[in-house]
Regions:
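Extracellular attachment/recognition segments
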Residues: 1-100
């Protein structure tokens, strides 16, 4: 079993959501199975703006790309009760990949 951890950063943005970002993780040995697990998150409205929390979406998934590489996709969205993605939000999503 091989384990590695990572962090995906989402810079401030408004106008759409949830959004996705990827990070490729390379293991020193060949793998045949892998799973990405969410280990933490830091989410906020940018610039210290004070809003109600209407909807928060955070998740991770993994896909094997080659003999020793996994692409981790993080999904993140934060909005208030307006139903629109009109407020700047940013954050980080922490993950671990377990592979064998």
């Amino acid at each position: 079993m091989q384990i590695t951890q990572g962090l995906i950063t989402f810079s401030p943005m408004s106008g759409s959501g949830p959004r996705t970002a990827t990070e490729d993780v390379t293991f020193p040995n060949a793998i045949t199975t892998a799973v990405a697990l969410l280990t933490g998150m830091n989410v906020e409205y940018s610039n210290g703006d004070d809003h109600h929390l209407g909807n928060l979406q955070v998740g991770v998934s993994g896909a094997i790309l080659g003999s020793n590489t996994v692409r981790v996709t993080a999904t993140y969205g934060l909005r208030d009760w307006s139903g629109n993605w009109d407020d700047d939000y940013d954050g980080t999503v922490s993950f671990v990949v377990v592979a064998s």
